[in-house]
């Protein structure tokens, strides 16, 4: 019974964390993060660091697979952040 209670508690905490990171637009995210994901499941994610997955910046600030790169990095043709 204790194991079931612990598992349920961990699950509830995980769900609360997921819900708290959801976003509808860039304005919902803190500095250094962007709103990315599918139409129904967007989350605030950190901008890409060196070698990490990225999407090029766009004027609509709509991203599906990842965020743009951190400052002083560029998103390469293979969607990885690298030195500009």
Swiss-Prot record:
Covalent S-S links between cysteines: 23-35, 29-44, 34-67, 54-75, 69-81
Superkingdom field: Eukaryota
Main location: secreted
InterPro entries: Prokineticin_domain
One Gene Ontology cellular component annotation held by this UniProt entry: extracellular region
Short name of one Pfam family: Prokineticin
Entry keyword annotation includes Plastid: no
Signal peptide per UniProt: 1-21
Keywords: Disulfide bond, Secreted, Signal, Toxin
Tissue: Expressed by the venom gland.
One function term, GO molecular function aspect: toxin activity
Subcellular location(s) per record: Secreted
Family: Belongs to the AVIT (prokineticin) family.
Protein name in the entry: U8-theraphotoxin-Hhn1d
């Amino acid at each position: 019974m204790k194991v079931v209670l612990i598992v349920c508690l961990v699950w509830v905490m995980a769900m609360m964390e997921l819900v708290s990171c959801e976003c509808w637009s860039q304005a919902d995210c803190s500095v250094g993060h962007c709103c990315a994901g599918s139409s129904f499941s967007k989350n605030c994610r950190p901008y890409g660091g060196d070698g990490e997955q990225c999407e090029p910046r766009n004027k609509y600030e709509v991203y599906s697979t990842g965020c743009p790169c951190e400052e002083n990095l560029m998103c390469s043709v293979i969607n990885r952040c690298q030195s500009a």
